[in-house]
């Protein structure tokens, strides 16, 4: 998984989707024979991001795969919204269970040399995601963003704070995306311009740059898609935290004491919310967050989607 094995192709989409041109290139690579071993593995992460055209291009090679090539498609579920029915029907399904917090904590202790206390806390609030647990345990900014997301449950009930809190949530996601992508984008642009002759002298250099406008625009398009993806992912993590916070309050309100909370470190605040809001209102809050995620998935502007969510949550908590 380090990306160094010659016969393992790991496809990680950086943009909002996996397009047909990218998939055709992958299929072409997969048609080659293994170079060092007996088998070649093509691992496609986030297969739910395949466009219809990309899914059709992949379907052809999945139906008649090259000799000794195995395709692994990773998707949240086998629901038609996550993976095309035609692809699903031609694949063997392997369900992966969510690891328990204890197992995640042990991974952090063994691999990251974290204290047992820090590892246990991060594992408990990570939602079963090892990478998220590691980020929360080691990155103070990630912990601050989580608290900001959970604070929206409180601020949404106050008219003077509600929309400002929503805008701050969107701004934080965009800022996180900029930090993650800006340095790479700058390096890519500089590398391309250098390859095209920028900074050079002599006959023809200016004309070469003028003729390369299409290549530069294509790079800018891919960079914009990558940053949008990073921003949407950051906002989605915040929304998942918020939804599970309301879920915890719903469990407490319903008296489901034997179920593990997603945010055990916020038990007092969750109990206070459960005492204030009955189950039907908490369910409306959860539906509002899930509705916001669905709106973002169909490219509604984040500000509009979050504002609508905040309005619904605020009304539910104030009624």
Language-model region placement:
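Clamp-loader machinery-focused feature within the broader ASCE/P-loop NTPase space
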Residues: 1-53, 79
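Structural recognition of the conserved hydrophobic beta-strand(s) that form the central parallel beta-sheet
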Residues: 42-45, 58, 69-76
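Substrate-engagement module of ASCE P-loop NTPases
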Residues: 62-66
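Charged, glycine-rich active-site and insertion segments that engage polyanionic ligands
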Residues: 68-69, 75-238, 255-319
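Conserved phosphate-interacting/catalytic interface
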Residues: 242
């Amino acid at each position: 998984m380090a990306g160094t094995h010659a016969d393992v192709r790991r496809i990680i989409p950086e943009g909002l989707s996996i397009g047909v041109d990218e998939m055709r290139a992958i299929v072409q690579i997969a048609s080659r024979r293994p170079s060092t071993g007996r088998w070649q593995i093509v691992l496609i992460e986030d297969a739910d991001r395949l466009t219809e055209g990309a899914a059709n291009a992949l379907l052809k090679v999945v139906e008649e795969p090259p000799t000794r090539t195995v395709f692994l498609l990773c998707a949240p579920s086998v629901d038609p919204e996550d993976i095309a029915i035609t692809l699903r029907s031609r694949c063997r399904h392997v369900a992966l269970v969510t690891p328990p917090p204890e197992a995640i904590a042990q991974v952090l202790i063994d691999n990251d040399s974290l204290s047992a206390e820090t590892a246990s806390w991060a594992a408990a609030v990570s939602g079963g995601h090892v990478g998220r647990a590691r980020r929360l345990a080691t990155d103070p900014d990630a912990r601050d963003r989580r608290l900001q997301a959970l604070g929206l449950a409180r601020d949404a009930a106050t008219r003077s704070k509600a929309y400002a809190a929503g805008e701050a949530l969107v701004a934080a996601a965009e800022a996180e995306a900029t930090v993650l992508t800006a340095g790479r984008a700058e390096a890519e642009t500089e590398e391309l311009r250098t390859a095209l002759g920028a900074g050079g002298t002599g006959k023809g250099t200016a004309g070469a740059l003028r003729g390369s406008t299409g290549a530069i625009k294509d790079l800018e398009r891919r960079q914009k898609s990558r940053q949008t993806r990073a921003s949407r992912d950051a906002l989605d993590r915040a929304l998942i935290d918020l939804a599970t916070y309301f879920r915890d309050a719903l469990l407490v309100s319903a008296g489901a004491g034997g179920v593990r909370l997603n945010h055990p470190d916020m038990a007092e605040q969750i109990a206070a919310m459960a005492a204030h809001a009955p189950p039907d209102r908490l369910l409306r809050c959860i539906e509002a967050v899930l509705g916001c995620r669905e709106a973002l998935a169909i490219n509604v502007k984040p500000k509009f989607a979050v504002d609508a969510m905040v309005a619904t949550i605020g009304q539910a908590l104030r009624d």
